[in-house]
Design a protein with these regions (language model features):
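Single conserved hydrophobic/aromatic residue that forms the stacking wall/gate
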Residues: 177-187
Length: 187
């Protein structure tokens, strides 16, 4: 089985979903954009703005939708004893809240409900300074106090987005997921 995830896109990607289907790919769409009357033909279409969704989470950014998907998947795998059966350690999803907070703020979604909670908890994770790439970015931005919502939206986010404008769209992913001291990534 070939599986593709789309994040923050796919809601209106009818021809792309048809192409994926022709290529034998299953696609899971994780999005938050407003859909039209019909949905893309995907293996799964997860969007809190679907007309049949009653979660009242339509204010989530795609990063929040993705996180909620991972929480649900993690819960399901745990209930089926999948981690133990495969001799794998269950991931601690809390450690990703730094990135969830960054994405939530940078997508300019309302800071209410679970968004607010994810940002508050994400800022706590950031203060622990365990993400090498994010630490390097914080140092470059000369943020010498506790990282704030303002810092995420106006100092860190724009630096990550700038790489995409000069043809290095994977730079942000490389930076935020590096296990090195980020020196090689930042060059």
């Amino acid at each position: 089985m070939k599986l593709v995830f789309t994040v923050d896109c796919g809601t209106m990607s009818y021809s792309e979903m048809e192409f994926a289907k022709e290529e034998g790919l299953d696609v899971i769409v994780l999005d938050h954009h407003q859909p039209e009357a019909k949905y893309p033909e995907a293996f799964a279409f997860i969007n809190p703005n679907r007309f049949d969704d009653d979660s009242q989470l339509g204010y989530l950014a795609a990063v929040g939708v993705s996180f909620m998907f991972l929480v649900s998947l993690n819960r399901k795998l745990r209930s089926e004893n999948w981690f133990d059966s495969n001799n794998l350690e269950e991931p601690n999803l809390i450690t990703f809240l730094d990135l969830i907070a960054l994405g939530t703020i940078c997508d300019s979604v309302p800071l209410k409900g679970i968004n607010r909670l994810m940002v508050i908890k994400g800022l706590e994770v950031i203060q622990k300074r365990k993400n090498h790439g994010l630490n390097a970015l914080i140092d470059i931005a000369e943020i010498n106090q506790k990282v704030s919502v303002y810092d995420l939206g106006f100092k860190l986010g724009p630096r990550i987005n700038a790489a995409g404008r000069i043809g290095k769209s994977n730079f942000g992913v490389c930076l935020l997921y590096t296990s090195d001291a980020a020196d090689e990534v930042l060059g």
